Amino acid sequence: MANPKVVLAYSGGLDTSVAIKWLQEQGYDVVACCLDVGEGKDLEFVKEKALKVGAVKSYMIDAKEEFANEYALIALQAHALYEGKYPLISALSRPLISKKLVEIAELEGAVAVAHGCTGKGNDQVRFEVSIQALNPNLKVIAPVREWKWSREEEIEYAKQHDIPIPIDLDSPFSIDQNLWGRSNECGILEDPWAAPPEEAYELTVALEHTPNEPDIIEIGFEQGIPKTINGKAYSLAELILQLNALAGKHGVGRIDHVENRLVGIKSREVYECPGAMTLIKAHKELEDLTLVKEVAHFKPIIEQKIAEVIYNGLWFSPLKDALVAFLKETQKNVTGVVRVKLFKGHAIVEGRKSPFSLYDEKLATYTAEDEFDHQAAVGFISLFGLPTKVYSIVNGEKKVSV
């Protein structure tokens, strides 16, 4: 009788490599699944490594464009920053990885899926809630959470089973990267008072070493979707990667954040998001030009909730779908070009234009070209201030001196 299959989210690192052998010992045939969401790894090597370690099959899926268009784009249009700082790098990729795990599990007739998360982080929640939403009949296995080994015990297990040990194992950092950015934790970063060492960064240049001349770029948007840089068209994934390089060269997008994790602890992390932060800033400026006041003032409430929902692993939820439906409605006229200066850690918007601009220079100007009806202000002020005036009249004699 054939062994039941389990589909493992495989990264090529020590944890998931050991997990292949461990799952085999539990009686499973392991199907490895590795997604390319822009992490910059040699994923063909990772695919082959899974087979060498013992997987019966290994999938390598190029999901960069799907990640960009279906996940990162929503974060961009929502200006999604958890606690006002974190651009949801890992939180955005987990639902897509979960989706692919479920798709392969159904294709392979697997009874379970597995991930390499510990019992301490947010990702275990994001994976398992997403998988439950997509296929409640699949069992979810978390080997690292179950085996409770120390790092030394895990390395010894790997040696005993001839599992290749990654050459970067001595690195003190825990890193996750995709198109939208790079997150880094552990090691010296666990001390919130310690300055991050320069080796903690990879996508961005230290301010001391950035160019002394700025780069001026123009980003073109169509209905809220970035399409061009300096007039040249790119796919969304390519555009984000281009901006990572352009803005990263100038040190844009470094974030040092102590955040409140979903599991109840605080965590200090360092993020690099040069492309994401540049796009969010440019997109917000174009919205300021094209959205009516009421929508512009209400949208940040939706944005904050979307960030929380994504961070908490509720991507496949009715609430997220409803929030995104509102978000998409706001993007119909967010078309135009934004000029950005990249210099010494800053993405500075210096100009914006749109065929749907609600800015009327003849109404805004203080020159002789002014077309604003100044006399209309008299009646407006009278009506606008009427509630305050009435309150003052009614309560004027009741005021108490302090």
Swiss-Prot record:
Binding of L-citrulline, residues: 86, 122, 126, 174, 183, 259, 271
SUPFAM superfamilies the UniProt entry points to: Adenine nucleotide alpha hydrolases-like (SSF52402), Argininosuccinate synthetase, C-terminal domain (SSF69864)
Pathway connected to this protein: Amino-acid biosynthesis; L-arginine biosynthesis; L-arginine from L-ornithine and carbamoyl phosphate: step 2/3
InterPro entries associated with the record: Arginosuc_syn_C, Arginosuc_syn_N, Arginosuc_synth, Arginosuc_synth_CS, Arginosuc_synth_type_1_subfam, AS_cat/multimer_dom_body, Rossmann-like_a/b/a_fold
UniProt EC number: 6.3.4.5
GO molecular function: argininosuccinate synthase activity; ATP binding
Localization terms from the record: Cytoplasm
S-S bonds: none
Protein residues bound to L-aspartate: 118, 122-123
Nucleotide-binding in keyword set: yes
Main location: cytoplasm
List of residues binding ATP: 9-17, 116
Similarity remark: Belongs to the argininosuccinate synthase family. Type 1 subfamily.
Alphabetical list of PANTHER family matching this protein: ARGININOSUCCINATE SYNTHASE (PTHR11587:SF2)
Subunit structure: Homotetramer.
Record's protein name: Argininosuccinate synthase
Organism: Anoxybacillus flavithermus (strain DSM 21510 / WK1)
